[in-house]
A protein has these predicted regions:
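Bacterial N-terminal signal peptides
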Residues: 1-10
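Glycine-centered loop/turn positions within well-structured domains
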Residues: 1, 34, 112, 298-299
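Active-site-adjacent loops and short helices of periplasmic peptidoglycan-processing enzymes
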Residues: 13-178
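Generic marker of residues within folded, mature protein domains
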Residues: 7, 15, 37, 64-66, ...
Length: 328
């Protein structure tokens, strides 16, 4: 007879450390849930355009709930066209499909496109109403250091996110909406022949051959240069966030270095299979003096490539095991 066991495992080895000049950073191996690096991970900071991911997440959610359609055409308000910076160059005479708006945000980082979606999804038809909705939804997703004042990351003293929250958000987009996530890897998007010089995706990792397929850059003078990135190599996916970098070129170099470090310094290994017995525990008043402790699921761990450290299995028995026993 065995008990199924969810145990605590401690890896004693070390990988080569990664030094980043970013003000804040977070690197996650999505496949195993292993956090590879944290720097000021919970500090609320200006997220710039990276916070557009929350607008996108909610739009994807509304589409899947049947509350919004990709082919639905939305009007463009005066409030939307007043935004400058990165835009789709929308006019108030336009009626734009939701699908074009999504690509306008993902590829072109359109501030105006965010507002069009926000006003359509807001409970009261305003961008502020949608921003409040974003904040409440973020809290339900476990993003405890995020407050939204607008839909596009336009500088505002109250508009903040932590890099950990951005990683949570990116992870949810990848996991929850694979059918829309592929848009993030698109290199170009041109809306109605407007601003042909502004059609390329700003993600510096796309096309480098390192598996990068998302997500979103951001920049303001206060926030510096940032990127929420993701890359898939084989069956492993890495998600990372950096912010507060000093230039566009530094951001590109830092992001590429992170991807290379995460994949080259760590590998996924299997240390046990479901129902494998990894230890024993004493039993009171039983026919047998001990019972086997088995894994409830496969044990796949992320470990440093060049480390031969050992895995320590620690099983914590919180209550005495008394006979009679049943499996499970």
């Amino acid at each position: 007879m065995t008990f199924l066991l969810l145990s605590t495992f401690l890896w004693t080895g070390k990988a080569l450390s990664f030094e980043t000049s970013a003000k804040a950073a977070y690197i996650l191996d999505q496949t195993t849930g292993t956090v590879l690096l944290e720097k000021n991970a919970d500090q609320p900071l200006p997220p710039a355009s990276m916070s557009k991911l929350m607008t996108l997440y909610m739009a994807f959610e509304y589409i899947n709930q049947g509350r919004l359609e990709l082919t639905e055409k939305l009007p463009v308000s005066d409030a939307a066209v007043k935004y400058r910076g990165s835009t789709m160059f929308l006019n108030t005479s336009d009626r734009v499909t939701v699908e074009d708006l999504l690509r306008g945000i993902i590829v072109l980082s359109g501030n105006d496109a965010c507002v069009v979606l926000a006003e359509a999804l807001s409970p009261d038809g305003t961008e502020k109403g949608f921003a409040d909705l974003m904040t409440r939804r973020a809290k339900k997703m476990g993003m405890m250091n995020s407050v939204f004042a607008n839909s596009n990351g336009w500088p505002h003293p109250e508009h903040k996110m932590s890099v950990k929250d951005l990683a949570i958000l990116a992870n949810r987009i990848v996991a929850d909406f694979p059918e829309y996530y592929k848009m993030f890897a698109e290199d170009t998007f041109e809306f109605d022949g407007r601003a042909a010089a502004n059609t390329r995706n700003r993600n510096p990792l796309l096309g480098l051959g390192i598996g990068a397929d998302g997500l979103k850059t951001g920049h303001t003078s206060e926030a510096g240069y940032g990127l929420v990135g993701s890359a898939l190599q084989g069956e492993r996916r890495v998600i990372f966030v950096v912010t507060g970098l000093r230039s566009q070129s530094v951001r590109a170099d830092e992001a590429e270095a992170i991807v290379n470090w995460a994949f080259r310094q760590f590998t996924q290994k299997k240390y046990g299979g479901k129902n494998d017995v990894i230890g024993f525990a004493p039993v009171w008043n039983g026919a047998s003096a001990q019972v086997g402790l088995a894994l409830a699921e496969d044990l796949d761990l992320l470990v440093p490539v060049f480390d031969d450290g050992d895995i320590n299995f620690n099983a914590e028995i919180k209550t005495p095991i008394k006979a009679p026993l049943s499996k499970g």
